[in-house]
């Protein structure tokens, strides 16, 4: 399954790295984060809830404006 997380608050490549690391630490998640698109495209295997994805991004210091 693929989900797109819309993220606010990323300003630089370091932000992208922090957001990527936060998502990739979750078991079953492989994320590609884009500063330009202000999103993360996650390939998910297993049972990972939207709340888990949202909490990982918020814990990294960013805001989630939507998950599709």
Predicted feature residues:
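Short glycine-/aliphatic-rich beta-strand segments at the starts of folded cytosolic domains
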Residues: 1-9
């Amino acid at each position: 399954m693929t989900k797109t997380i819309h993220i606010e608050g990323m300003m630089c490549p370091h932000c992208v790295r922090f957001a990527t690391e936060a998502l990739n630490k979750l078991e079953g998640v492989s994320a590609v984060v884009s500063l330009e698109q202000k999103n993360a495209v996650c390939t998910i295997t297993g049972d990972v809830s939207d709340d888990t994805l949202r909490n990982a991004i918020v814990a990294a210091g960013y805001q989630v404006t939507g998950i599709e």
